[in-house]
Structures are given as C-alpha cells and as structure tokens.
C-alpha cells in the first residue's frame, strides 16, 4: 500500500541520515522532502514527488534531481559578494565545493538504497 511505501522510504532515508517529511493530503501527488545537515553544517534539502501512488515516479524524480545536481552551482549559491561562504556556509570556496560534492554522494546513496528496496 501507499502508506507502507511511505513508511519504507522514511525508514531508509532515516537510516541514511536524512530527515524526511511527507505531504500526503493530495493522494495523486505525494511530496517528500529530504533534509540533512552537511559535514560543514549547511542545512540542505530537496523535494521529490510520488505520482498516482507509484513508487517508481518518486525514484525517477530523485534520479533526475541527482543527475541534474551540480556541486559547483550549488556551491556558487552559497558564495557571498566577498568571495567567501555566507549564510552558514564554510568560509573557503574549496570547502563549500567539497561539502556539495559530499552532499551529491549522499543523495546517490539514498537513491541507490531506494532502488535496491523497490526496483
């Protein structure tokens, strides 16, 4: 059932170090928000949707997010006008990039765990 799938996704995400919230009031589109703090303490999150109670749509959405994830661009978003980290990001650009590269790996690990469980 859909509730069992939501529970499994939640359990797997938590095992991988992610916090998760699920917005399932609309049964045709259930939104999952995955959140974690990076090694350098940045609050990182992303969303993916499950359409029509089909777990494959959630995994496909997460896969698209992972494939489109650009650590350099994500790091750029955290660089202030002075060329250093802002809003809680590390001071040095190289550390911001490293943090986002590690975040990309964490997204991949979560995606892989869900694929093993559901595909």
Question: What label would you give each PLM region?
Answer:
Residues 1-45, 116:
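Negatively charged, low-complexity tracts enriched in Asp/Glu with abundant Ser/Thr
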Residues 1-5, 99-106:
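Short amphipathic alpha-helical segments
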Residues 9, 58, 62, 107-110:
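Generic structural signal of hydrophobic/aromatic residues within well-ordered alpha-helices
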Residues 38-102:
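Intrinsically disordered, low-complexity regulatory segments enriched in Ser/Thr/Pro
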Residues 101-119:
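Acidic, proline/glycine-rich low-complexity IDRs
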């Amino acid at each position: 059932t859909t509730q069992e799938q939501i529970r499994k996704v939640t359990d797997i995400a938590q095992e991988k170090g992610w916090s998760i919230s699920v917005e399932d009031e609309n049964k045709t589109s259930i939104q999952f928000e995955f959140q974690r703090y990076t090694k350098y303490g940045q609050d990182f999150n992303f969303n993916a949707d499950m359409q029509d109670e089909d777990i494959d749509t959630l995994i496909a959405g997460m896969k698209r997010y992972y494939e489109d994830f650009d650590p350099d661009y994500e790091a750029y978003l955290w660089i202030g006008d002075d060329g250093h980290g802002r809003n809680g990001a590390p001071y040095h650009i190289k550390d911001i990039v490293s943090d986002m590269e590690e975040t990309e790996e964490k997204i991949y690990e979560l995606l892989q765990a869900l694929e093993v469980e559901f595909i």
